[in-house]
Amino acid sequence: MNANVSKLLNEQINKEFYSAYLYLDFANYYAAVGLDGFENWYRVQAQEERDHAMLFYQYLQNNGEGVTFEAIAKPEWERGDHMTPLKKALEHEKLVTASIDAIYAAAYEAKDFRAMQMLDWFVKEQGEEEKNAADLITKMELFGGDSKGLCMLNSELKARVYTAPSLVL
């Protein structure tokens, strides 16, 4: 495997675990303010991010590459209103998308077709992640502070269940 692609994949493991930490912090915020549906949404999101990290880990292991673990940074964000985590999540997903795209570009340059094939799944996944984050913001904006709308959305988000990724390495 190309050394740069391996390095970037190793770094992505840390970024995915950071994403899980960030989303658990959002879940913790929503639990503290009594929005258990939002808490559930971000707890499930944290599970997804953890699994993304493990997919990168497994890909590197399957290809004879060592994995280097770095410290996971503490999530830093300013608590504000209930919209703050939603906006921060969209901003964060855009950063993750840029990171995946950079790994894909490096794999393309190195003609690492197996890595590109694996990354195809993540490119599609990131499109879904950004759309989901943007959709939550849109729904919150539609309510315009209406508590009934917030309760309805909270109930909707409470129904989300975790589904393991479909990528097979």
Question: Predicted segment positions?
Answer:
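Iron-associated oxidoreductase/ferritin-like identity signal
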Residues: 1-169
